[in-house]
Amino acid sequence: MTVDSRFYAPLGALTLEEIAGRTGSNLAGKPNQVISGIASAANAKAAEIAFIEGDGKRQPTISPSLAAVFVAAEMKHFIPEGVGVLETAFPRNAHSAIASSLFRPRHLMGAGHELVSALAQIHANAIVQPGAVIGPGAAVGEGAVIGANAVIGPGVQIGRNTSIGANASIHCALVGDQVTILAGARIGETGFGVLVGPQGAEDSPHFGRVIIQDHVTIGANSCIDRGVFEDTIIGERTKIDNLCQIAHNVVLGRGVIVAAFGGISGSVRVGDGSMLGGRVGIADHVKVGDRVSLAASAGLFRDVDSGETWGGTPAKPIRQWMREVAWLQKQANPKKSN
């Protein structure tokens, strides 16, 4: 996905030679080739740079339009001819460094001292309560209510009849119609992308968005992180309780229900109509089918097919889990012998 300029300001293009110099990478390609964008390897377009990691055994998905790529030595043989190769022991770290040289989030840039930017578009029938901050390029639709001290970042779009609670903050997001976001929610912050590099742990910059479709409810003090390159998506009529965490690149389908304290890790997919009980945790990259039910406090580490009900930690089909619980109770409380 191309970086959305409404949320990220371009800082100027770089040549492959400049990129190699800044990252200490070994370049095989055209030194003067210009790079102006960043992306994942699977979705890159012309003039965009990506990274590829792996053990050298599995073929990665590579866009035919990819211009250049950071790659470790064991993955070089997968790179098609004509793609600029920057060899480094830390491909993801090098890519993150260059991404931060090419773009900067607009909400981290100076925007003046006015609470409501003159460059924001606010419908005449919208309500903006005292202390709210609305950044340049933001748009607030008809009938929307922006609560006291809420922050609507640069470029953010708020749909019609949508309610944003007091002290909520929304960055890098497109919010649909008739959405309810309760007090203190945090939408579009950087996700928990931690890289391990030569200097130790580093934060990975995020350049994606959050898409919240129509009729969604997001509870008080819940957090939905923006994607790394792709979008975090909350499907139509999904309902998220208070104090939930939705990580980067998660896609929740239509009509999903997430009860309080739910934690969904990065790149999880949850199908339409699925129900997650309180304190459910889902490990990263897991795929949950349609109409799946997860019992309260379930810890899910593997994919679940549509229509199934699971529980326990590690989560498993509900009948199997209940049999195991019953057996454990029996072992813990043996009958007294005469």
Swiss-Prot record:
Pathway: Bacterial outer membrane biogenesis; LPS lipid A biosynthesis
Family: Belongs to the transferase hexapeptide repeat family. LpxD subfamily.
Xref: Gene3D superfamilies: Hexapeptide repeat proteins, MurE/MurF, N-terminal domain
Top enzyme class: transferase
UniProtKB keywords: Acyltransferase, Lipid A biosynthesis, Lipid biosynthesis, Lipid metabolism, Repeat, Transferase
Annotated catalysed reactions: a UDP-3-O-[(3R)-3-hydroxyacyl]-alpha-D-glucosamine + a (3R)-hydroxyacyl-[ACP] = a UDP-2-N,3-O-bis[(3R)-3-hydroxyacyl]-alpha-D-glucosamine + holo-[ACP] + H(+)
Family annotation (HAMAP family): LpxD
Protein name from the UniProt record: UDP-3-O-acylglucosamine N-acyltransferase
Subunit: Homotrimer.
Origin: domain of life: Bacteria
Pfam families registered for this protein in UniProt: Hexapep (PF00132), Hexapep_2 (PF14602)
Function: Catalyzes the N-acylation of UDP-3-O-acylglucosamine using 3-hydroxyacyl-ACP as the acyl donor. Is involved in the biosynthesis of lipid A, a phosphorylated glycolipid that anchors the lipopolysaccharide to the outer membrane of the cell.
UniProt GO cellular component terms: membrane
Organism: Hyphomonas neptunium (strain ATCC 15444)
